[in-house]
């Protein structure tokens, strides 16, 4: 789910908006109480430029949808119509937007998600190719397989090209000349999210069917086999978003063999994904992540962090709107105040946060996940996520990386 954003100009909450975080910390490595601003609320100069280090490989597994985004002066009321100020249609979803952010920061992003065939699926493929994200379609619908779109025909502009023995033959996967093009229905799992952005505040409203029940019949078998045989580089970091749990389990198994750090975007609690937080090195939870407790749902951020650490996570990050992001690990705890920005559009800011967090942690060994390493990664993610809210849409912010 896209990250939330509060305190944007015009809301009355704060005169200048800041992205992510809340709450406070206590003894080293454990949550506590008090003022988050006192713990880590100092103002910082933002830095969101793409770093020049070696190009890390990130595998992102989860949900892909089509985002239809409209910028309006005010949302329509009942039985009302309004004229949008701007619009964008793009691939969306937590893992998808995180992969786009990872690629924008200089990483090689591989997205594994069910997409299938049809006009909406082709729109998704074109958008991902333009952003430099490699798609592995794991859909069980028409056209679905675990073959990368880069294995089919010539690579699209902007996407990494496969060379050597993995390169496809010329015209591979394309219909013969003059052959009829079959008309196929949409894959059952591909959803559309209708997103309305209020121009004065940057706040968003979203309506979506989210992930639908779809059989993932090709759970990365081809990709995993190539990595295991050394024909493709192993991922440096793996991010899952809790959608399509079976696919997430396969990716986490691969990460364990490859020694890759694992990150979970825990936007909200999902019963079907209950096993996943304990298998991940870092769990980035939103304020709406409420795991089950002995007497009901666990809701307080410090209690959520306790729950995740006890479940097996090595590091925990909790974000809540415009207040400082909180993190905990065995090496300590702290909070990070994001830079102040004038928010234009908050849609997908949480997803960008997770993609930037994965990029900052890529290549970090599990045993090296110390407080300073996690804290620096959270600070970096706050900077990039805040920058993403300063322009309309989920793509234009990439041009502002300085």
Residue ranges and their predicted role:
Residues 1-57, 83, 298-402:
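Conserved phosphate-binding/catalytic region of the ribokinase-like
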Residues 41-44, 213-216, 262-268, 367-368:
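Short gly/ser/thr-rich secondary-structure transition/capping motifs
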């Amino acid at each position: 789910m896209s990250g939330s954003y509060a305190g944007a100009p015009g809301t009355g909450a704060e005169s200048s908006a800041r992205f992510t975080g809340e709450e406070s910390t206590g003894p080293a490595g454990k949550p506590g109480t008090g003022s988050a601003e006192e713990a880590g609320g100092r103002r910082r100069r933002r830095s969101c430029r793409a770093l020049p280090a070696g190009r890390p490989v990130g595998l992102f597994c989860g949900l892909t949808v089509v985002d239809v985004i409209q910028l309006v002066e005010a949302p329509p009321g009942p039985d009302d119509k309004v004229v949008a100020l701007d619009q964008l249609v793009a691939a969306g979803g937590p893992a998808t937007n995180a992969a786009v952010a990872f690629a924008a920061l200089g990483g090689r992003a591989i997205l594994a998600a069910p997409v299938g065939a049809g006009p909406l699926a082709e729109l998704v493929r074109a958008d991902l190719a333009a952003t430099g994200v490699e798609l592995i379609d794991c859909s069980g619908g028409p056209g679905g397989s675990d073959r990368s779109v880069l294995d089919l025909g010539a690579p699209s502009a902007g996407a990494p090209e496969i060379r050597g023995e993995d390169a496809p033959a010329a015209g591979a996967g394309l219909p013969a000349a003059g052959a009829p093009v079959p008309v196929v229905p949409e894959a059952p799992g591909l959803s559309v999210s209708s997103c309305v952005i209020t121009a004065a505040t940057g706040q968003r409203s979203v309506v979506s069917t989210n992930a639908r029940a779809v059989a993932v019949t090709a759970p990365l078998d081809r990709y995993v086999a190539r990595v295991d045989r050394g024909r493709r580089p192993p991922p440096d970091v793996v991010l899952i978003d809790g959608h399509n749990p079976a696919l997430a389990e396969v990716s986490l198994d691969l990460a364990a063999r490859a020694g890759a750090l694992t990150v979970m975007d825990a936007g909200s609690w999902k019963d079907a994904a209950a096993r996943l937080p304990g298998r991940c090195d870092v769990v980035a939870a939103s304020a709406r992540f409420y795991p089950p407790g002995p007497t009901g749902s666990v809701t307080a951020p410090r209690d959520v962090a306790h729950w995740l650490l006890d479940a097996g996570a090595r590091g925990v990050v909790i974000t809540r709107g415009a207040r400082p992001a909180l993190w905990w690990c065995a090496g300590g705890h702290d909070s990070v105040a994001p830079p102040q920005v004038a928010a234009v559009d908050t849609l997908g800011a949480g997803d960008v946060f997770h993609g930037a967090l994965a990029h900052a942690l890529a290549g970090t060994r599990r045993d090296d996940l110390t407080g300073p390493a996690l804290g620096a990664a959270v600070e970096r993610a706050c900077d990039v996520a805040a920058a993403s809210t300063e322009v309309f849409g989920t793509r234009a912010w990439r041009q502002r990386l300085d």
